[in-house]
Regions:
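Active-site bordering "gate/hinge" segments
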Residues: 1-295, 302, 311-314, 338, ...
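Dual-mode signal for accessory low-complexity, basic/Gly-rich regions
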Residues: 268-439
Length: 439
């Protein structure tokens, strides 16, 4: 929690820096706390509670830039911390691209509360939290003789920050989160010990799904029994909403100013170019009330806005912060996306599977990588073989390979099943003609 006294301290620290040799500065005061209760076979295994608060300050001194942080918030100690930071910055190389954003780009306030904080957070009983985790385990224990172990957990936390810049920005944000999970390992064929999990998370305690988590984890792991490789070849690939973000991540990483400026992005010079199918429609929706990831300003204080990332497969924007915009000589956009929503289709996962004659449903990625310069990728996967619209065999120890642009150009369908508790609301995805290596 950020108090009024905390804010006054931050404002004093800003003034002190400007009066002691610093021409410009930005400051972040933060306060975070979290708790987790981890159980093994319904018995307490690990309890963890943590809280931290601190101050980070970026100093612009004689054309040079340095960033420093401390968790010692006594005024006297902050005086020496700031003075030492200013002196240290003077030893650094000049960098004319290190400037604060133009003040006209800052969020000026006046919009409704985004409703990201649950006041109930402070009144929850630890015994109730443990009971939620224990209930998830008890849904599993004794339900199948092949069960080896059952893990379950409950966790929650709060995050708060207060930001200032010397050229006029002031902003505050706070949020809460709650989560419950279960994981189950069972005895499979021979030495096989498949495992799986399930979880739910929410920004408000009353919206957290607290039952059925263990049951779902057990259901998922039992479906893995008898896993083996399928034949190598080209398949229609479906990726479930738990894992679709794995394929979106390399695409987004290629849009950041740092990658573009270093010419290490496979989407360099692709603005307003078609790099995916017409089904690729991705929006940044930062102002959705009560949604994880919603915010009115980014980490520079720049006002967020609704913006298309991809429209019918065409790239519409990059994520270019102030520093990289100066380095590249282009206009800045935003430092990072907030809440990403891929336009959904009209079928759930079962409906998508029913439409596929020969395919693989991917329910997990196991290692691998994507080359950020070329977009070439290779990932280990597990999931299910699809024949004539039905899941006929669990598979594992297979690899999927290709190129990100080629892959997203082969996107033929999108589900209607995104996880609404995520920063990335990405439904199930269907790609045609994807290369798999197996047996």
């Amino acid at each position: 929690m950020i108090t009024d006294n905390n804010k006054k301290l931050a404002q004093w620290a800003m003034d002190y820096a400007l009066k002691n040799g610093c021409q410009a500065a930005k400051l972040v005061l933060y306060s975070n706390s979290n708790a987790s209760f981890e159980l093994r076979d319904a018995k307490m295994d690990k309890l963890q509670q943590a809280s931290e608060s601190g101050l980070s300050i970026s100093l612009y001194v004689d054309g040079k830039y340095g960033s420093y942080s401390t968790n010692r918030l006594d005024k006297k100690e902050l005086e020496s911390f700031i003075r030492n930071g200013i002196e240290s910055t003077r030893y650094l190389a000049e960098d004319e691209a290190r400037v604060l954003p133009d003040s006209s780009r800052y969020y000026k306030g006046g919009k409704p509360d985004l409703q990201l904080f649950d006041d109930k957070f402070y009144n929850l009983n630890p015994d109730d939290k443990v009971a939620i985790a224990r209930a998830a385990a008890e849904e599993v224990l004794g339900k199948d003789e092949r069960i080896i172990s059952v893990g379950s957990s409950y966790s929650d936390g709060e995050e708060a920050s207060y930001r200032l810049t010397s050229n006029g920005f002031e902003g505050e944000s706070k949020s809460t989160w709650f989560s419950v999970s279960a994981d189950v390992a069972v005895k499979g064929e021979g030495e096989a010990r498949p495992s799986s999990y399930w979880y739910d998370s929410a920004m408000f305690y009353d919206k957290l799904i607290k039952s059925g988590i263990g049951t779902k984890a057990l259901e998922r792991v039992l479906k893995k029994l008898g896993q083996r490789k399928a034949a190598s070849g080209k398949y229609t690939m479906i990726v479930d909403p738990m894992n679709a973000g794995q394929l979106l991540s390399p695409l987004l990483s290629a849009l950041y100013g740092s990658a573009l400026q270093q010419k290490s992005s496979f989407l360099l010079n692709k603005l307003n170019t078609k790099v995916g199918s017409d089904k690729l429609n991705l929006m940044d929706e930062p102002h959705l009330i009560g949604a994880r990831g919603a915010r009115y300003f980014d980490n520079e204080g720049v006002a967020t806005e609704r913006r298309p990332i991809f429209e019918n497969g065409t790239l519409k924007t990059y994520f270019i912060d102030t520093y990289n915009s100066k380095k590249m000589g282009v206009e800045p956009t935003i430092s990072s996306p907030s809440l990403l929503i891929l336009q959904p289709g009209n079928k759930d996962l079962d409906g998508l599977v029913a439409d596929v004659q020969k395919g693989i449903l991917v329910t997990g990625f196991n290692g691998g990588n994507s080359n950020k310069s070329t977009g070439d990728f290779s990932y280990g996967i597990e999931g299910f073989l699809i024949e004539n619209g039905k899941l006929v065999q669990p598979v594992n120890e297979m690899n999927v390979t290709g190129n990100m642009i080629t892959l997203w150009s082969s996107l033929v369908a999108v589900g209607n099943d995104p996880r609404l508790s995520s920063y990335w609301r990405i439904p199930s995805l269907v790609f045609e003609g994807v290369d798999f290596s197996g047996s």
